[in-house]
């Protein structure tokens, strides 16, 4: 079996009024009584090389065709009708601006009517077929008319060739809706899909691929055709006898990537129906995006999905002799067809960018309008396979960035966000830093978007445990079943995998918070909600969260004490490492209460560690001596074993605490003095004896009594607190006790 694609010379059909297949030309011996040697172009006008004067003028755009009525009347039903209906004197003037294919197609159709040989190629056959349909050149007027012969060329030549099918489909872009109505687009799409899905074992054909290294293609005295172009692709022909190599699974990516987005979608849809592996479908979609949206893909080509990379790396599992291709210069002997130029590259510079350029600048450089950009993004979103890991998470996030920038339909953006949530653990910080296109400049980055992605991830993690994960087609149903399957982390849905994914996402979120915390416009609520979105079990260490909190405090120095405490509540001090604790102990931006919690938690951890160590040592020693006496270290032993740096931090904290306690005692003393003065005033008031045993005096007296009792109680509580502080190792003189006054009403 072989797909022949060496039709550069213009494979065609010829006929002597009948159905004969010649050597690459389309002709008719019936010239309607007008003998001609050909057509002549003079400026913007075509003339028939004959002595008979022209009696028909056809205008198509800027071109004029000076023809004769009879050759066209005998083969075109539309021309027959238009000329009959026309009341113009000779020469009859017809304007056919709506003719599909334009002046080029009408020129070929006119030559066919005059019996001039016409070269049929993959680049002109679709326009000529549509023009023949427009002109109604059917079999009713003549056997072997233009419709029949162009259909024969399409069916027997084009559709059997991979390269010609691509070229014809590309040429149909300017022939809508004629190419659609004549099923040219559908037939070419299905032909391409069938060839792309066929197992390449034992099949040889020509296709466009990436150029091999110069050391393998630098032939003496010759220059390969693919090397004539600056493009990185080349033409692989089955007729070359050079070093053979197995065909990679992505051999067809480069060719289908030149198609317009609507035709590309038709091809991918047909390929999907035939059962192509979802990894290959995802890889070709990323390849297409790299061609038409160069700012979307990182420099260096398409990043193949994890499963796809293992498939390509493992190869097809075929022997080198079972299927091979030959790459080299294309034969030019007798070829009058279109120059292949190393591949089907009508958008050669689409995928070549130096560095990470802005998406808008790259797209503008291609001359793609915003409307077309939006159509490309929406179409790519709609054809991404539903299976997890069909495309990389990095690609999805870049596509999401472009979708937000181009104002894509909200339903498609929501669907894309769910896809990102399915594999959110594969994301990187650089991909998450998506500018806030829709928040009217409130924040530098779209934090709400990351919050939604995280919610989709958590929902996905919850459903994975209860329902089977999205499984790929079984090997018996998958295209290229012998390709080794990569480890997608896609099956099982075990708790261990889920927990590891949550831990990776937690580290990613902490890094993201550290980056966006520098934005002065970021509200505290958004920071707190994103930090608390993950469950506590997702973080075994809160160092990353502490780093993000510290960055937020640096960028927002005007936060109140309450807001700083509220911010620090998202962090668990017991999950901080020793380095983070030492940094927090000296961090003046943290509230004092948080610093004390950090130091206390670290001291508790050190005490427990020392206690466990001493307990193990005593247990080992007791077992060796035959006795077991557990040794509980006292406070002095623990403090002496504490690292010096930690003791210094704890001493500074204790000094601050003692200062606060001293100030509190001063306030209490002043309060007691005021209480004494108040009681003296009360007694003086009672001795006046102006009004006795009245409701008002009773109220005053009871009020003073209650206030006195409350004062004594608060004094007693403060005394208990200070006593507790002394027990904790703080040496202060006991507070002065207030004199006990006898309260009497006399």
Swiss-Prot record:
Database matches in CDD domains: BTB_POZ_NPY3-like
PANTHER family in UniProt: OS12G0117600 PROTEIN (PTHR32370)
Designated gene of the protein: RPT3
Biased composition (Basic residues): 735-746
Bias (Low complexity) ranges: 466-478
Alphabetical keyword list: Cell membrane, Membrane, Phosphoprotein, Transducer, Ubl conjugation pathway
Domains: entry comment: The BTB/POZ domain mediates the interaction with some component of ubiquitin ligase complexes.
Family named by the database record: Belongs to the NPH3 family.
Membrane topology: Peripheral membrane protein
Subcellular location: Cell membrane
Tissue expression notes: Expressed in hypocotyls, guard cells and mesophyll cells.
Native organism: Arabidopsis thaliana (Mouse-ear cress)
Annotated protein name in UniProt: Root phototropism protein 3
Subunit and partners: Interacts with PKS1, PKS2, RPT2, PHOT1 and PHOT2. Subunit of a complex made of CAR6, PHOT1 and RPT3/NPH3.
Gly residues composition-biased segments: 9-19
Function: May act as a substrate-specific adapter of an E3 ubiquitin-protein ligase complex (CUL3-RBX1-BTB) which mediates the ubiquitination and subsequent proteasomal degradation of target proteins. Signal transducer of the phototropic response and photo-induced movements. Involved in the phot1 pathway under low blue light (LBL) fluence rate and in the phot2 pathway under higher fluence rate of blue light (HBL). Necessary for root and hypocotyl phototropisms, but not for the regulation of stomata opening. Not involved in chloroplast accumulation and translocation.
Pathway: Protein modification; protein ubiquitination
Chief location bin: membrane
GO biological process: blue light signaling pathway; phototropism; protein ubiquitination
Stretches assigned to the BTB domain: 54-122
